[in-house]
Amino acid sequence: MIRFTPFRQRKGYAAAVLFLIAFLSGCGNDIHPVEGQVVWKGGALAKELEGSHVVFELPEKKTSARGIIQADGTFRLSTHKPNDGAPAGEHKVLILEDRKNANAEGTLLAPALLDPRFADLKKSGLTATVKPGANTITLTVERAQAR
Protein backbone atom coordinates (compact mmCIF):
# COMPACT_ATOMS: atom_id res chain seq x y z
CA MET A 1 0.00 0.00 0.00
CA ILE A 2 1.29 3.43 -0.96
CA ARG A 3 0.96 6.12 1.63
CA PHE A 4 0.91 9.70 0.53
CA THR A 5 2.88 11.76 2.95
CA PRO A 6 2.50 15.53 2.99
CA PHE A 7 5.83 15.78 1.13
CA ARG A 8 4.65 13.45 -1.66
CA GLN A 9 1.34 15.29 -1.90
CA ARG A 10 3.10 18.64 -2.27
CA LYS A 11 5.46 17.16 -4.83
CA GLY A 12 2.46 15.85 -6.79
CA TYR A 13 0.70 19.22 -6.64
CA ALA A 14 3.85 21.01 -7.75
CA ALA A 15 4.24 18.65 -10.71
CA ALA A 16 0.60 19.17 -11.69
CA VAL A 17 0.93 22.96 -11.48
CA LEU A 18 4.13 22.93 -13.57
CA PHE A 19 2.47 20.71 -16.18
CA LEU A 20 -0.55 23.02 -16.34
CA ILE A 21 1.64 26.12 -16.74
CA ALA A 22 3.67 24.46 -19.50
CA PHE A 23 0.51 23.28 -21.26
CA LEU A 24 -1.24 26.64 -21.13
CA SER A 25 1.82 28.60 -22.21
CA GLY A 26 1.89 26.62 -25.45
CA CYS A 27 -1.79 27.10 -26.27
CA GLY A 28 -3.23 30.01 -28.17
CA ASN A 29 -0.18 32.26 -28.09
CA ASP A 30 0.81 31.41 -31.63
CA ILE A 31 -2.39 32.65 -33.31
CA HIS A 32 -1.96 36.00 -35.06
CA PRO A 33 -4.57 38.23 -36.76
CA VAL A 34 -4.74 37.74 -40.53
CA GLU A 35 -6.79 39.76 -42.96
CA GLY A 36 -6.40 39.98 -46.67
CA GLN A 37 -7.86 40.29 -50.09
CA VAL A 38 -8.23 38.08 -53.13
CA VAL A 39 -7.44 39.72 -56.46
CA TRP A 40 -7.61 38.53 -60.04
CA LYS A 41 -4.40 38.38 -62.05
CA GLY A 42 -4.14 41.99 -63.19
CA GLY A 43 -5.08 43.45 -59.79
CA ALA A 44 -8.89 43.76 -59.75
CA LEU A 45 -10.54 42.69 -56.49
CA ALA A 46 -12.18 39.26 -56.85
CA LYS A 47 -15.58 40.48 -55.64
CA GLU A 48 -17.30 37.78 -57.72
CA LEU A 49 -15.90 35.16 -55.32
CA GLU A 50 -18.07 36.40 -52.44
CA GLY A 51 -18.97 33.48 -50.16
CA SER A 52 -16.00 31.36 -51.23
CA HIS A 53 -13.69 29.93 -48.56
CA VAL A 54 -10.00 30.73 -48.15
CA VAL A 55 -8.13 27.94 -46.31
CA PHE A 56 -4.61 28.29 -44.88
CA GLU A 57 -2.98 24.91 -44.08
CA LEU A 58 0.11 24.67 -41.87
CA PRO A 59 1.43 21.15 -42.58
CA GLU A 60 3.94 20.90 -39.72
CA LYS A 61 1.28 21.76 -37.12
CA LYS A 62 -1.51 19.87 -38.90
CA THR A 63 -3.83 22.82 -38.45
CA SER A 64 -5.83 25.10 -40.69
CA ALA A 65 -7.39 28.55 -40.59
CA ARG A 66 -10.39 29.55 -42.68
CA GLY A 67 -12.05 32.71 -43.87
CA ILE A 68 -14.96 33.66 -46.10
CA ILE A 69 -14.47 36.09 -48.97
CA GLN A 70 -16.69 39.13 -48.48
CA ALA A 71 -18.49 41.22 -51.13
CA ASP A 72 -15.48 43.54 -51.37
CA GLY A 73 -13.01 40.67 -51.98
CA THR A 74 -11.57 40.71 -48.45
CA PHE A 75 -11.34 37.97 -45.81
CA ARG A 76 -10.36 37.45 -42.15
CA LEU A 77 -9.03 34.13 -40.91
CA SER A 78 -10.32 32.09 -37.99
CA THR A 79 -8.62 29.12 -36.29
CA HIS A 80 -10.18 28.61 -32.85
CA LYS A 81 -12.69 31.46 -32.67
CA PRO A 82 -14.06 34.01 -35.15
CA ASN A 83 -11.42 36.28 -36.67
CA ASP A 84 -8.66 35.19 -34.27
CA GLY A 85 -6.20 34.60 -37.12
CA ALA A 86 -3.76 31.82 -37.93
CA PRO A 87 -0.61 30.26 -36.47
CA ALA A 88 2.73 31.75 -37.50
CA GLY A 89 4.49 29.93 -40.32
CA GLU A 90 4.54 29.24 -44.05
CA HIS A 91 1.03 28.17 -45.10
CA LYS A 92 -0.22 26.42 -48.20
CA VAL A 93 -3.40 28.11 -49.37
CA LEU A 94 -6.46 26.99 -51.31
CA ILE A 95 -9.74 28.64 -52.24
CA LEU A 96 -13.01 26.72 -52.36
CA GLU A 97 -15.32 28.55 -54.74
CA ASP A 98 -18.93 29.06 -53.69
CA ARG A 99 -20.65 28.43 -57.01
CA LYS A 100 -24.01 30.12 -57.28
CA ASN A 101 -27.17 28.53 -58.66
CA ALA A 102 -27.76 29.25 -62.34
CA ASN A 103 -31.52 28.75 -62.11
CA ALA A 104 -34.29 29.46 -59.61
CA GLU A 105 -34.81 25.76 -58.82
CA GLY A 106 -31.18 25.39 -57.72
CA THR A 107 -30.66 22.39 -59.98
CA LEU A 108 -27.93 23.93 -62.13
CA LEU A 109 -24.68 25.51 -60.97
CA ALA A 110 -23.32 28.62 -62.61
CA PRO A 111 -20.03 28.16 -64.47
CA ALA A 112 -16.90 28.25 -62.32
CA LEU A 113 -15.26 31.67 -62.10
CA LEU A 114 -12.04 30.48 -60.46
CA ASP A 115 -9.45 28.23 -62.09
CA PRO A 116 -10.10 24.83 -60.43
CA ARG A 117 -6.44 24.33 -59.51
CA PHE A 118 -6.91 26.83 -56.66
CA ALA A 119 -9.12 24.28 -54.85
CA ASP A 120 -6.20 21.81 -54.55
CA LEU A 121 -3.35 22.39 -52.06
CA LYS A 122 -0.93 20.50 -54.28
CA LYS A 123 -1.78 22.49 -57.40
CA SER A 124 -2.83 25.95 -56.24
CA GLY A 125 0.67 27.37 -55.98
CA LEU A 126 -0.60 29.78 -53.33
CA THR A 127 1.44 30.24 -50.17
CA ALA A 128 1.36 32.84 -47.42
CA THR A 129 3.65 33.62 -44.52
CA VAL A 130 1.98 34.49 -41.22
CA LYS A 131 4.30 36.36 -38.86
CA PRO A 132 3.82 37.26 -35.18
CA GLY A 133 1.58 40.33 -34.96
CA ALA A 134 -1.02 41.60 -37.42
CA ASN A 135 -0.81 40.32 -41.01
CA THR A 136 -2.27 41.62 -44.29
CA ILE A 137 -2.06 39.20 -47.21
CA THR A 138 -2.99 39.52 -50.89
CA LEU A 139 -3.78 36.34 -52.83
CA THR A 140 -3.63 36.59 -56.63
CA VAL A 141 -5.77 34.09 -58.56
CA GLU A 142 -6.73 33.39 -62.17
CA ARG A 143 -10.13 33.00 -63.77
CA ALA A 144 -11.39 29.66 -65.03
CA GLN A 145 -10.92 29.04 -68.74
CA ALA A 146 -14.12 29.46 -70.75
CA ARG A 147 -15.35 26.18 -72.19
Regions found by a protein language model. Give the residues of each.
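Sec-dependent bacterial lipoprotein signal peptides
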Residues: 1-26
